[in-house]
Amino acid sequence: MTIQVGEKLPQAQFRVMTEEGPQVKTTDDIFKGKKVALFAVPGAYTGTCHKMHLPSIFLNAYAIKDKGVDTIAIVSVNDAFVMNAWKRDTDQRDEAVFLADGNADFTKAIGMELDASGHGLGIRSKRYSMLVEDGVVKKLNLEAMPGKVEVSGGDTLLGQI
């Protein structure tokens, strides 16, 4: 079942690259006591994610943070090495936390898994954005089609804060 507005995020683990290598971060580490703008993409470096979704987030990052958001987080079903390379290649190292959900544990726990096996991509995340306050979903914008950025971009979430 897909998570809904008003529900608490389940406990899960992500991997985040640090100078010491991949480190585990829990949902509590990321969301507890914080206001977080979470953006999920089906895959790092994929066309829509890289050319449309990510730019919409970074174009609005300062304005989102100016509205009281503590953290901007980007999650994808990729490993921490890929997410770190993607972060480095965007030159946005300080604007967002890139969360690796390599086994799709978080994605499955919130009912946002997408079977992209037909495209050779395996299980991925649906494309969405959400505003999370202290671990509770306050806003949720789920795309009807994974190749579109119509409601999950940074501009939409900014307008909802």
Where are these regions (language model features)?
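Chalcogenol-based redox active-site neighborhoods
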Residues: 1-161
